[in-house]
A protein has these predicted regions:
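A short acidic-Thr-Gly-centered motif at the start of a beta-strand
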Residues: 1-3, 65-69, 373-389, 596-600
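A common structural junction motif
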Residues: 631-639
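Generic long, charged, amphipathic alpha-helical segments
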Residues: 422-442, 551-606
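Conserved catalytic palm subdomain of right-hand nucleotidyl-transferase polymerases, strongest
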Residues: 6-7, 78, 99-102, 382-398
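Active-site palm subdomain of RNA-directed nucleic acid polymerases
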Residues: 188-200, 590-613
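Conserved "right-hand" nucleotidyltransferase catalytic core of DNA-directed polymerases
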Residues: 1-17, 28-31, 35-37, 46-47, ...
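Active-site-proximal helix-loop-helix substrate-binding element of RNase H-like nuclease domains
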Residues: 28-34, 38-189, 346, 426-431, ...
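Short active-site loop/helix that positions an aromatic residue
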Residues: 13, 81-93, 110, 254-258, ...
Length: 657
């Protein structure tokens, strides 16, 4: 057994941590560590030591640093990425993630909140073990720059001598964070983390530490021009409408009414609908076009790049391990690479070249309003390291493949094995006629496509509408499409029922229920666990059945973080939603294994988005694409019979092929 040291630090930097992320935060010239609290697992829970870095005890500092740099001692922290990055910068020593364990990730794997205070409260820790609520004010006082005033002598930073009483409170706060982290760790110690997940987290940390290169000169030109262009559009809107503030919805709606255009609401969708009207007055059309252009917030991602990039023009820390705690998938941070506009420009490379040259006049002439072009160029700001190119490889239709595999929908699996178009095959099964993409009954392919994307997780008409954004299927046909898809996929429909029945059974009877392909439902300490084929488990905290007076039925309810409100509370689930979680979790595990295989070949994965990975590859390595695609398509031992395929391409900048 390794000795374990729990760590928490308080720091100072003039860079905003929330806006820039920890990697840019520690590069500020004034970055410093103020307080360090630590405890060893063999000391007893009340023996936390605190180092005041302004007046450090040399013996304590030596003890801490010796343990920190000892590879035989395991270090734990809540959000260990922060402690690792700060301590590495402060000591100018590497902090290998293999020596660390992240208590936040442990909490996330169990469906708990990803913040120390929230996790402690969700676990019902006693008051003396909870995070100190005074912390935010103390952090603002000591860890961030202060506004110079006559009262404070025009200083821009508060030091311990400026308020000794507050400083003592800050030391107590720092100590209490270790107490809370250790109590959370103790409470969760009965739930073992697979070693494979720890290895994957270490790979994730290396990826975040390495980061991805950005074309900063191009980004700077885009931000500078966009600022000017937005001002021009604002002035044009004022001139056309005569309004002091055309951004005001109330003012704009009154003006529209005066032009004979009644719009009950002015949203992206209603503006798009209005612009389709050939009889729309020209002045109204132009004003609505301007409003749409000014509403493009994607340019904010370029501003984030400028704030968050490091001195070597690399962006780090853009992936949060286990950020989606229902499936264990990664979540985006800072630039939010999981939420980027599609590439639809006829010549993306030319548009990018014009942006890099700062020739925005030609760009506007060739491609239209620059705000929309900039939205599509965000991906292209990510560039390979010097002497490299990107190889981008992703799983082809991974969720549809996994869903068919866990359900045992053989016709779908066979279609994938034969390399057929799944949308055509689905439409063919639904309507009992041959369907070819550019041939017989090709008009049915769109129905097959929308159904594949909308119906797999018990989706109905509402899901069809969300997927069919262009309204290609008449509304009165949607229910029929849903029914046809369900009729063609009886094994998937059965899987929804089986998963819901399994969950209800384990909640009521507290026993294990096993399904196909290594999936098993269990119930431990009031929590529902779903074991995946990989051996990883999904957790639904405090799962129970609860009567809903609206329909008189008992629903499956668990405690979780609401994806919209971000608040901890009761959340309902059902068969189709459980199938969605399982499918996406297995897809995530497939990507994880593929990334580990690619990394084992010596390749440098700079980031991954959904089901694709982006790899920095030396230009002279001409076999890389084939080798990386092979890793993606290689069979996985715990998923026999799952047909996987990697599709990839090479590119001098990130893009969607």
């Amino acid at each position: 057994m390794h000795r374990v040291m729990g760590v928490d630090i308080e720091t100072y930097s003039s860079v905003d941590l929330a806006e820039a992320g920890v990697y840019a935060y520690v590069e500020a010239p004034d970055f410093d560590i103020l307080l360090i609290s630590y405890i060893f697992d063999d000391w007893g829970e009340d023996n936390v030591k605190t180092i005041d870095c302004f007046d450090a005890d040399p013996d304590m500092m030596a003890e801490f640093c010796e343990a920190l740099l000892d590879p035989q001692i395991v270090k734990t922290a809540f959000n260990a990425n922060f402690e690792r990055t700060c301590l590495a910068k402060w000591l100018q020593k590497p902090m290998p993630p293999e020596e660390w364990r992240c208590t936040m990730v442990k909490a996330l794997t169990l469906g708990l909140p990803g913040n120390l205070a929230g996790a402690g409260e969700a676990l019902g820790l006693p008051p003396e073990k909870l995070k100190d609520p005074q912390g935010k004010a103390l952090i603002r006082f000591f860890s961030k720059p202060c506004k110079p005033t006559r009262t404070n002598g025009q200083r821009t930073r508060n030091l311990p001598q400026h308020d000794p009483a507050k400083w003592q409170l800050y030391k107590s706060y720092n100590r209490q964070d270790v107490v809370t982290e250790q109590e959370i760790l103790r409470k969760l110690s009965i739930y073992k983390t697979p070693e494979s997940e720890q290895e994957l987290w270490a790979l994730d940390q290396h990826m975040n530490d390495n980061g991805v290169a950005l074309d900063i000169p191009m980004v700077e030109k885009i931000v500078e021009y966009d600022t000017r262009r937005r001002q021009e559009l604002q002035e044009e809107a004022q001139e056309l409408t005569g309004l002091k503030n055309p951004n005001s919805l109330a003012q704009l709606k009154r003006w529209l009414a005066e032009q004979g255009v009644e719009m009950t609401s002015v949203t992206k969708d209603t503006i798009t609908e209005a612009l389709r009207d050939p009889d729309l007055p020209d002045v109204v059309r132009r004003v609505l076009e301007i409003r749409t252009a000014l509403g493009k917030t994607s340019v904010a991602k370029y501003s984030t790049m400028l704030v968050a990039h490091c001195q070597d023009h690399r962006l780090r820390g853009i992936l949060q391990f286990y950020g989606a705690n229902r499936s264990g998938r990664w979540a985006g941070r800072l630039v939010q690479t999981h939420n980027l506009a599609k590439n639809t420009l006829p010549d993306l490379a030319l548009a990018r070249e014009l942006a890099a040259e700062g020739d925005f006049e030609t760009m506007g002439t060739l491609f239209g309003e620059t705000a929309f072009v900039f939205s599509e160029l965000i991906r292209t700001a990510f560039i390979p390291s010097e002497g490299c190119r990107f190889v981008v490889s992703d799983f082809s239709a991974i969720e549809a493949r996994v869903l068919a595999w866990i359900a045992g929908e053989e016709w779908t699996l066979e279609a994938f094995r034969q390399g057929k178009d799944i949308y055509c095959e689905t439409a063919s099964m639904m309507y009992h006629v041959p369907v070819e993409k550019h041939g017989a009954n090709s008009h049915l392919r769109q129905k097959g496509k929308v159904a594949v994307l909308a119906c797999g997780y018990q989706g109905g008409v509402g899901a069809m509408k969300r997927m069919d954004k262009g309204g290609t299927i008449p509304e009165d046909e949607l229910q029929s499409v849903v029914d046809q898809w369900r009729g063609a996929n009886p094994s998937v429909v059965k899987l929804w029922r089986n998963c819901e029945m399994a969950a209800r059974t384990v909640i009521e009877e507290h026993r294990t229920v096993r399904l196909k392909n290594g999936i098993a439902f269990g119930y431990v300490n009031g929590n529902l666990f779903i074991k995946l084929p990989s051996g990883r488990k999904l957790c639904y905290w405090n799962t129970h059945l609860k009567m809903d007076p609206r329909d008189g039925r008992e629903h499956i309810v668990y405690m979780g973080v609401n994806q919209e409100t971000k608040q901890w509370g009761e959340t309902e689930t059902y068969g189709g939603k459980l199938v969605e979680n399982i499918t996406q979790a297995i897809a995530r595990d497939c990507l994880a294994i593929s990334m580990q295989r690619v990394a084992a070949l010596g390749y440098n994965i700079v980031m991954h988005v959904h089901d694709e990975m982006i790899v920095d590859v030396p230009i002279e390595d001409t076999d890389a694409l084939e080798r990386i695609n092979a890793c993606m398509g290689e069979a996985i031992p715990w998923a026999p019979g799952l047909p996987l395929r990697g599709d990839g391409y090479e590119t001098p900048f990130y893009m969607k092929d």
